[in-house]
Amino acid sequence: MNSNDNQRVIVIGAGLGGLSAAISLATAGFSVQLIEKNDKVGGKLNIMTKDGFTFDLGPSILTMPHIFEALFTGAGKNMADYVQIQKVEPHWRNFFEDGSVIDLCEDAETQRRELDKLGPGTYAQFQRFLDYSKNLCTETEAGYFAKGLDGFWDLLKFYGPLRSLLSFDVFRSMDQGVRRFISDPKLVEILNYFIKYVGSSPYDAPALMNLLPYIQYHYGLWYVKGGMYGMAQAMEKLAVELGVEIRLDAEVSEIQKQDGRACAVKLANGDVLPADIVVSNMEVIPAMEKLLRSPASELKKMQRFEPSCSGLVLHLGVDRLYPQLAHHNFFYSDHPREHFDAVFKSHRLSDDPTIYLVAPCKTDPAQAPAGCEIIKILPHIPHLDPDKLLTAEDYSALRERVLVKLERMGLTDLRQHIVTEEYWTPLDIQAKYYSNQGSIYGVVADRFKNLGFKAPQRSSELSNLYFVGGSVNPGGGMPMVTLSGQLVRDKIVADLQ
């Protein structure tokens, strides 16, 4: 009998972090209950069908597929038997106000031709930048990812002071790191916008975030066949096969405590579920406020883990095709510094935002009726700020600015061709997922506030309470929150020993 068999684990929240934790713990022999307040698993990886269109409501990009594969192989399964993924090419298409269009491509020769549009020597600079990005990634994978390092002191202990200083470019911002190698302003902007993965500003995030381009080029950029939600369905199926009990439409209202430990979770319907270990996929600060009723002194310690940005999310079904689009597209601001400062410093809506646009029908036409396509639009905007409240009219005005900008940059008569629409503001995101102040990516990466670290996975209040998801290390995005579930299993097993 496995020594973990009698350990009852309750996982709160069935986002990818919660699903990953449940699977990893069940594989290690724990008895696991997974409690989800919504009517389906997946968290922000969500799906909606409307008027013949199938919308992926959450993440649109899959990278680092080996992290997902590890969940399945750890359980003696093959991921390909549960879900199919395919590479997306080009990675991104980048549109600028002057009419320039630059693709990011996996194939080196194609990438050279694209970057040659920006002038001689640009590709050589890009290659030197990728070498720098690779070094950052290699060092990060060795400790932060592989060992689950959970903060600055863990990092210093593992790498040592000198290696930490030399390996992670600690005195520069992401933007400064890019500009060490890249002189063309368009390529600077493209590389800076890899920060979209973690919902932060390249001017405030540490240079370590420059590992993101190498991750994308090395591991590829992928799509889940049939829609991104298929990954959540595959993980749900695996969890059930491993004996995880999943309760949907069940909201946790309290984590009950005794002698410095979590002893049970209480549901909104009054049910009390005893637990030996609790794992929360609810973000750390909302969980401390809502489930733990943490004292002000504990909450104050968490202030440096400020929420990431949010987004105005437009899911459009249009009755025509836009052949100039790739699967993933960026329409850049003419004033990138002003855009990021608006979002992250003054907490207002940008006058000229950079826009991320996903056209999944380029890879998967079956997601829309014949002759139609899906266009998902996501400009980054501030998280909810109680001191600078934005109104429905403010969000509506931004929607109009965004659509006008896209029409000006080539999406002719876009507004006239919208036949169905789903429109989310930070208020909707907060209400649906209980994310901290409506943030999308968990905790902001800011070298002055938190050195780019997220909150620790172990609770500082209760010895058997752990956290997973985008608000804790290693951070936001599909692969990182999935990795967090695997790392928390390792911490729990180590703590029990």
UniProtKB/Swiss-Prot annotation:
This is 4,4'-diapolycopene oxygenase. Involved in the biosynthesis of C30 carotenoids. Catalyzes the oxidation of the terminal methyl side groups of 4,4'-diapolycopene to yield 4,4'-diapolycopen-4,4'-dial via the aldehyde intermediate 4,4'-diapolycopen-al. Also able to catalyze the oxidation of the terminal methyl side group of 4,4'-diaponeurosporene to form 4,4'-diaponeurosporen-4-al. It has moderate to low activity on the C40 substrates neurosporene and lycopene, and has no detectable activity on zeta-carotene or beta-carotene. The keyword Nucleotidyltransferase does not apply. It catalyses: all-trans-4,4'-diapolycopene + 4 AH2 + 4 O2 = all-trans-4,4'-diapolycopene-4,4'-dial + 4 A + 6 H2O; all-trans-4,4'-diaponeurosporene + 2 AH2 + 2 O2 = 4,4'-diaponeurosporenal + 2 A + 3 H2O. It comes from the Bacteria. Its EC number is 1.14.99.44, 1.14.99.-. InterPro entries: Amino_oxidase (IPR002937), Carotenoid/retinoid_OxRdtase (IPR014105), FAD/NAD-bd_sf (IPR036188). GO terms for biological process: carotenoid biosynthetic process. Belongs to the carotenoid/retinoid oxidoreductase family. Keywords: Carotenoid biosynthesis, FAD, Flavoprotein, Oxidoreductase. Disruption phenotype: Cells lacking this gene accumulate the fully unsaturated C30 carotenoid backbone 4,4'-diapolycopene with some additional less unsaturated intermediates. It comes from Methylomonas sp. It is an enzyme of class 1 (oxidoreductase). The gene is crtNb. GO terms for molecular function: oxidoreductase activity. Pathway: Carotenoid biosynthesis. Pfam families: Amino_oxidase. Its cofactor is FAD. CrtNb is not a carotenoid desaturase, in spite of its apparent sequence homology.
